[in-house]
Every structure is written in structure tokens, then in C-alpha cells.
Design a protein with these regions (language model features):
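A detector for short metal-coordination/catalytic motifs
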Residues: 5, 23-26, 35-125
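Internal active-site segments that recognize and position negatively charged phosphoryl groups
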Residues: 1-22
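The −1 position to Zn-ligating cysteines in a subset of zinc-ribbon hairpins
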Residues: 17, 30, 54
Length: 125
């Protein structure tokens, strides 16, 4: 029930659009936890402010710490990516969004504490 509530709430908050690209194909957007699900308490798991709506590519990059969202909602890409990959796709898909801001949700703004957790414990420096 909590997962269903979380997913529906995050999709609604972002109006079904990836907060990075604006892409809205339902099968390609994922309600991603900012603070990872496995370390959340029960209330954090269901809290839509602990969510970003991301397309599948950015969901995976975010979960793996290859990118993060700073408290001012700016996207930052890991030095791991910057220093290790210089192919065109990496430049376009990851480095191309660095420094841009995510599209703000109409409600349930990303929780600053959850963003801080991701920045400190998930993001690869």
C-alpha cells in the first residue's frame, strides 16, 4: 500500500513528467526515492517529498550515485563520471544536464534532509 501511495503521489506531483527531461511516457518514468528505500523508516518510504519522478536512465544514474540533486534543486554529476568517461552519450545525457535545475513539482517539494542524505551517502564523489 505504501509503495502504491508513494508512486501515485510522486507521479501526480510531477504531473507524470520526468523532473529532468520533462518526458512523460508512463512506462519510462519511475517514482524514485531520494533517500534509498532500504534505509528509510516506514514514514520516509511513503513520503512523496522523498521522491523524484525520473526517466529510467536518470533513475538508475541517481540510484547508483552518478548524479545527485543539491538542496537548491540543481543537478550535480559525480567526478567519477567526469573523470572516467568522455564519450558523446555521457556528455549529452549526464554532463549535459549538470548545473541545470530539476522541474519543480506542483506539490511535495523534495525534502532537503532527504537530498542531504543522498548527497552524503549515495553520491559518488
Amino acid at each position: 500500500q505504501a509503495r502504491k501511495f508513494f508512486r501515485k503521489s510522486v507521479i501526480s506531483a510531477y504531473e507524470g513528467r520526468c523532473c529532468i527531461t520533462g518526458q512523460s511516457i508512463p512506462q519510462m518514468v519511475i517514482a524514485s526515492h531520494i533517500k534509498p528505500y532500504y534505509v528509510c523508516d516506514k514514514s520516509e518510504r511513503a513520503n512523496p517529498a522523498n521522491g523524484l519522478l525520473l526517466n529510467a536512465f536518470y533513475d538508475r544514474a541517481f540510484d547508483q550515485g552518478l548524479m545527485t540533486v543539491l538542496p537548491d534543486l540543481t543537478i550535480q554529476v559525480s567526478d567519477y563520471v567526469k573523470d572516467g568517461y568522455d564519450d558523446q552519450n555521457t556528455r549529452d545525457w549526464l554532463l549535459g544536464v549538470e548545473g541545470t535545475k530539476i522541474i519543480r513539482p506542483k506539490r511535495f517539494a523534495p525534502n532537503r534532509d532527504m537530498l542531504a542524505y543522498h548527497n552524503e551517502f549515495v553520491f559518488l564523489r
